[in-house]
């Protein structure tokens, strides 16, 4: 049996908890995210509307993989598949380790290229550019479509109004084989941008500031929709930068609207691309202009954040954390010397970024002792930058060019940070050790600030190149409200009933076992020392389950128990054993305040079911506030009625403690669980 991952609408006692609604109890309009998912969901009843919290089977418009294409291909072939379901749906790009000329890497690249040619898949070789940039340039990611990729920065596509979201390799193999995978529609947060961005501030400053001022997981595992009158004045490149870093903000997507600015962008793309182009042409752009889609007036959002753009100024992330952001005004006064500067990545190495940096650096030289690295997002971007002279201006200043690709951003190739060094980068992540040594310090900033810092030899702004101080920064004007309504359910009330497949239980119940901690990571669930012991028996997996969290866990728990834990359960690595070890203990359900996204996908993919119920963990924390035990048998019993989308919790004497509606678990997801997980489901589809 397995665990499934459902969520509830609940009061938010901890910022960042999922607040989801069930379509079976709410009759309302849809937001833009839900409308796009509706378009790409398959197997729905004719009158079925999808909402946050629902599990759906999706058939995305396109699926991109990069250097991980060969592991995906290996998994695909391991499923017994021989031909991809739809070669027009799949895109392969080589972008991460393009500087690596080792025999092993070249062999992998050769295998990917050959596989793509054999299958008729669109393939872009090393040097053509970063996959996400190619997806946008070539129109695979397109406004109002659903595009996925086996990469965490798939959120980028939201900048052009495409619902982009990441998947794991098993999902990608499923799409290759069947055209489909599953998705749970996240809670949707509306981020309203008001006012106009002041001179000197950029799209990068918006997202860096957002990551810093809302840094308590407010949008963790949410889909974001950017709205407000401030959006219309943001260029598409600014939108792409913002959407790209919604990943670091913790979101699963970052969607901008289709508006006049975006339509004008595509009018220009039509002029630039060879015509007739299969995806970006006069007809597709005309259709986009005439058939804009917006959220319904009565759409529901889990959160509503408001930021006044006019109160922003240049901001910098770090060191070594995107949750720490400091104004350029404050940081420039600290005289932080730098060793390396980077204008690379899918975040900020488009043409406008390179031109902005060139405008700052032209006529100057990179400071002595500083190495400045530049790589275009794609070969097309580099050609355009060369054509306008911006590329040469940067090279003449002393920058070192790298091939179009990810490179230093992912910690690969030339120019990585060494022990004790300080770097400033226009990339998206500055986690400790990501861009080189764990003993280095990494900051993130806009292309303009990176270029100025490279010349100054310290973190500073363009104003300082003219001998002027960085202007003072105002306090950022912002607010956040949460939809804190709780669905209190009358157990006798009638409601729509969910069909249950043969082999799937109509209800799941057991005693709640409290593991009272937030951020229990995959190593806490399944110790890393066992991860690569492929021959470890199931009984041993059951024995070591949760031992790094609590060595007494195995003595205190039994088959059929239900783990309940705090927020962000299963954060950390992608190891699938974190899910399968729980199954090995014959536990049918895990409940938490929230889950790590990769863990939640691995749960379903391995036939493990989970529920998010923030209100329940909050109640248990109140009850056991004085306890020091890591694992507690609560004497509370949970029953999940799958047919009614409803959870009830009672004590040992039968007293009702909580009744809660949850998202709908349809027959599509039930089928995956009955088949033993996504791989079993794919094999069954291939047989049929």
From Swiss-Prot:
Cofactor binding comment, as recorded: Binds 1 [4Fe-4S] cluster per subunit.
Cofactor: [4Fe-4S] cluster
Chief location category: mitochondrion
EC number: 4.2.1.36
Binding residues for [4Fe-4S] cluster: 346, 406, 409
Family matches, as PROSITE patterns: ACONITASE_1, ACONITASE_2
Pfam families: Aconitase, Aconitase_C
Reaction catalyzed: (2R,3S)-homoisocitrate = cis-homoaconitate + H2O
UniProtKB keywords: Amino-acid biosynthesis, Iron, Iron-sulfur, Lyase, Lysine biosynthesis, Metal-binding, Mitochondrion, Transit peptide
GO cellular component: mitochondrial matrix
Signal peptide region: none
Pathway: Amino-acid biosynthesis; L-lysine biosynthesis via AAA pathway; L-alpha-aminoadipate from 2-oxoglutarate: step 3/5
Family as reported in the entry's similarity comment: Belongs to the aconitase/IPM isomerase family.
Function text: Catalyzes the reversible hydration of cis-homoaconitate to (2R,3S)-homoisocitrate, a step in the alpha-aminoadipate pathway for lysine biosynthesis.
Name of the protein this chain belongs to: Homoaconitase, mitochondrial
């Amino acid at each position: 049996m397995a665990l499934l991952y459902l969520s509830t609408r609940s009061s938010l006692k901890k910022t960042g908890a999922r607040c989801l609604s069930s379509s079976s109890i709410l009759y309302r309009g849809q937001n833009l995210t839900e409308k796009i998912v509706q378009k790409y969901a398959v197997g729905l009843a004719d009158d079925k509307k999808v909402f946050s919290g629902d599990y759906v089977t999706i058939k995305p418009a396109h699926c991109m993989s990069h250097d991980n294409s060969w592991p995906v291909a290996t998994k695909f072939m391991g499923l017994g598949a021989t031909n991809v379901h739809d070669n027009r749906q799949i895109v392969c790009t080589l972008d991460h380790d393009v500087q690596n000329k080792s025999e092993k890497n070249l062999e992998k690249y050769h295998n990917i290229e050959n596989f793509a040619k054999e299958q008729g898949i669109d393939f872009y070789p090393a040097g053509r550019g970063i996959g996400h940039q190619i997806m946008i340039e070539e129109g695979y990611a397109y406004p109002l479509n659903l595009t996925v990729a086996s990469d965490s920065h798939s959120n980028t596509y939201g900048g052009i109004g495409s619902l982009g979201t990441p998947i794991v390799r098993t999902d990608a193999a499923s799409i290759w084989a069947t055209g489909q995978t599953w998705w749970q529609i996240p809670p949707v947060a509306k981020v309203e941008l008001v006012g106009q961005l002041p001179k000197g501030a950029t799209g990068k400053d918006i997202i860096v500031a957002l990551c810093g001022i809302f840094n308590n997981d407010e949008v963790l595992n949410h889909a974001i929709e950017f709205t407000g009158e401030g959006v219309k004045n943001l260029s598409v490149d600014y939108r792409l930068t913002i959407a790209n870093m919604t990943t670091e903000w913790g979101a699963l997507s970052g969607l901008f609207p289709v508006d006049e600015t975006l339509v004008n962008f595509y009018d220009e793309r039509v002029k630039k691309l060879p015509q007739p182009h299969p995806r970006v042409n006069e007809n597709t752009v005309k259709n986009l202009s005439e058939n804009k889609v917006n959220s319904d007036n009565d759409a529901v959002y889990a959160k509503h954040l408001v930021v006044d753009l006019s109160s922003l100024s240049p901001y910098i992330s770090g060191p070594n954390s995107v949750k720490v952001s400091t104004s350029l005004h404050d940081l420039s006064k600290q005289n932080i010397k730098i060793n390396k500067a980077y204008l690379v990545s899918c975040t900020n190495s488009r043409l406008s970024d390179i031109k902005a940096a060139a405008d700052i650096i032209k006529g100057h030289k990179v400071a002595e002792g500083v190495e400045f690295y530049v790589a275009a997002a794609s070969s097309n971007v580099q050609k355009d930058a060369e054509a306008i002279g911006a590329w040469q201006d940067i090279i003449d200043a002393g920058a070192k060019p790298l091939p179009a690709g990810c490179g230093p951003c992912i910690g690969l190739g030339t120019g990585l940070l060494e022990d004790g060094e300080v770097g400033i980068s226009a990339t998206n992540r500055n986690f400790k050790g990501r861009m080189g040594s764990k003993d280095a310090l990494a900051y993130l900033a806009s292309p303009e600030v990176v270029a100025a810092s490279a010349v100054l030899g310290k973190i500073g702004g363009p104003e300082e190149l003219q001998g002027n101080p960085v202007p003072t920064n105002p306090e950022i004007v912002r607010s956040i409200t949460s939809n804190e309504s709780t669905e209190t359910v009358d157990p006798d009330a009638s409601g729509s009933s969910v069909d249950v497949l043969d082999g799937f239980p109509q209800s799941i119940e057991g005693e709640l076992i409290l593991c009272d901690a937030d951020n229990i990571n995959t190593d806490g669930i399944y110790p890393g020392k066992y991860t690569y012991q492929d021959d470890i028996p199931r009984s041993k997996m059951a024995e070591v389950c949760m031992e790094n969290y609590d060595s007494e866990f195995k003595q205190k728990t039994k088959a059929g128990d239900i783990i309940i834990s705090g927020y962000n359960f299963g954060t950390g690595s992608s190891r699938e054993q974190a899910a399968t070890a729980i199954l090995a203990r014959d536990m049918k359900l895990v409940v938490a305040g929230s889950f790590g996204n990769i863990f939640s996908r691995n749960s379903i993919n391995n036939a493990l079911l989970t529920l998010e119920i923030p209100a329940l963990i909050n109640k248990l924390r109140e009850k056991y506030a004085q306890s020091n035990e890591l694992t507690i048998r609560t004497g509370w019993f949970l029953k999940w009625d799958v047919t009614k989308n409803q959870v009830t919790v009672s004590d040992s004497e039968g007293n009702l403690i909580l009744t809660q509606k949850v998202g709908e678990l349809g027959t599509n997801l039930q089928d995956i669980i009955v088949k033993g997980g996504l791989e079993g489901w794919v094999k069954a589809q291939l047989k049929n």
